[in-house]
Amino acid sequence: MRILGLLLGVLLLAGCAEKAPAPEKFQFTAKTLEGAEFRGDKLVGQPAVLWFWTPWCPSCNAEAEMVEETAKRHDKVQFVGVAAEDQLDAMKKFVSDHKMSGFPHLADLDGSVWKRFGVTAQPTFAFVRTDGGVELLTGSPTEEQLDQHISALTPKT
């Protein structure tokens, strides 16, 4: 009986334990292009893809539709666009021109999110595993390559 009581106490304490803090690179708050708050720590524990882009980048413009369609196909993966190196109006125009409504886009006006992830060129994709690990891919992958990287983030069923 005493062991049962001890076990129950341990289980209760374990249930009250605080969640481990998010890795440093996810400890940020940013604004979406619409002005809503976005917390980076919400990405931890789920597969995610961050797409770092600029409105004036020819490769970013060329791949925007493919990225949008890929996000729709991979609905169990959180996609986030991270725009930088331009003004908010240009970022909004890019999203509007490419009809990108399937996932949020952050206005990284000061480049701080790019810095957190070590991004120095665009386009860059950050593939976020559920354990918080990140793999960066700079350049324009084919649709097949993008699908392969994303499939590696999600468990096989």
Where are these regions (language model features)?
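Short active-site neighborhood of thiol/selenol oxidoreductases, capturing the structured segment around
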Residues: 40-61
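N-terminal "domain-start" segment that seeds a small globular fold
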Residues: 16-40
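Sec-dependent bacterial lipoprotein signal peptides
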Residues: 1-14
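Hydrophobic beta-strand anchors of alpha/beta hydrolase catalytic cores
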Residues: 49-50, 79, 125
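Structural microenvironment flanking redox-active thiols in thiol-disulfide oxidoreductases
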Residues: 61-98, 109-113
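Thiol/disulfide oxidoreductase modules built on the thioredoxin-like
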Residues: 96-102, 109-153
